[in-house]
Amino acid sequence: MWRGRDVISARDFGRRDLEELFETARYMEKYSKSRLEFLRGRVMAVAFFEPSTRTRLSFEVAMRRLGGDVIGFWGAEGTSVEKGETLVDTVKMLDAYSDVIVVRHRYEGASKLAAEVAESPVINGGDGAFNHPTQAMLDVYTMWREFGTVDGLNVGLIGDLRHARTVNSLLETLTNFRVRVYLISPEYLRPRVETIDYVQSRGLKLSFHTNVEEVIHELDVLYVVRIQKERFIDPLEYEKVKGSYRITVDMLKNARRHLIILHPLPRVDEIDHRVDATPHARYFRQAALGVPLRMALLYLILQS
């Protein structure tokens, strides 16, 4: 089901796809610090037009752990892109050199365009404000590993839910499971209407809240994204809102004992650092699982 497929949108993958990916990732966990030879002789090209730490590094480590090689660039500086080379021409060049291409771009649809011109599979490493499918796969995989299932979970999403592309892809991925989602944000930072309409049409149960303390006692998972300061005209309004959506140790006193807190990272100040020492913190394990998850993804796409 996976071999040779592009990974452009979370909407393209169903439950069976995800379950196969998760089972393969769990196998890969045993080898996430070893070196295998599954992809020996294969080359992954990375075309990252935007900054990235975890996505880029986990893809690189994953490919090397599988025995493959990595080429590419991280930012346009020092490349022909800086001279004005188009995305299409850049992708065609990378396609000639590699077996799979990972693209990260600020413009929505960049990965889809790359897939249309490349013969090799293309993986969306994050584009525009609404797509980051492999992060969503990692987020749901972390839930699956923590609880043994995703079905039946109460999942809270808190912060700037409109402008975080991880949120959009996560909601789309969660439509494959029987979960209830609590959207916790100011009304003007809720996900865009198109996303809400789509996930509800797929049967995802949503409820809307402005205060996390009203619902924290019901949650199994709390997924935190930062409030994006650059979206506010009034700095005072930003400071007011930011403080209302910050996770603290005191806030967790009413949480379920098994609640896990996830974050796609990087964290700014939306989670108090003292939360790191609580049994609820799972965001660093979540980031670490990015290697076996992406090992599984590359293996399934490139397997002979």
UniProtKB/Swiss-Prot annotation:
Which GO terms of the molecular function aspect are on file?
amino acid binding; aspartate carbamoyltransferase activity
Q: Which reaction does it catalyse?
A: carbamoyl phosphate + L-aspartate = N-carbamoyl-L-aspartate + phosphate + H(+)
Alphabetically sorted, this entry's keywords are:
Pyrimidine biosynthesis, Transferase
Domain of life, per lineage: Archaea
In short, the EC number is 2.1.3.2
Annotated residues that bind carbamoyl phosphate are located at R54, T55, R104, H132, Q135, L265, P266
Q: Which GO terms describe its biological process?
A: 'de novo' pyrimidine nucleobase biosynthetic process; 'de novo' UMP biosynthetic process; amino acid metabolic process
Stored InterPro entries: Asp/Orn_carbamoyltranf_P-bd, Asp/Orn_carbamoylTrfase, Asp/Orn_carbamoylTrfase_sf, Asp_carbamoyltransf, Asp_carbamoyltransf_Asp/Orn-bd
Pfam families (alphabetical) = OTCace (PF00185), OTCace_N (PF02729)
So where does L-aspartate get bound? Answer: K83, R165, R226
Q: What is known about its subunit structure?
A: Heterooligomer of catalytic and regulatory chains.
Report the NCBIfam families cross-referenced here. Answer: asp_carb_tr (TIGR00670), PRK00856.1 (NF002032)
Similarity comment: family membership: Belongs to the aspartate/ornithine carbamoyltransferase superfamily. ATCase family.
Q: What does this protein do, in the record's words?
A: Catalyzes the condensation of carbamoyl phosphate and aspartate to form carbamoyl aspartate and inorganic phosphate, the committed step in the de novo pyrimidine nucleotide biosynthesis pathway.
Indicate what this protein is called per its UniProt record.
Aspartate carbamoyltransferase catalytic subunit
Gene source species = Pyrobaculum neutrophilum (strain DSM 2338 / JCM 9278 / NBRC 100436 / V24Sta) (Thermoproteus neutrophilus)
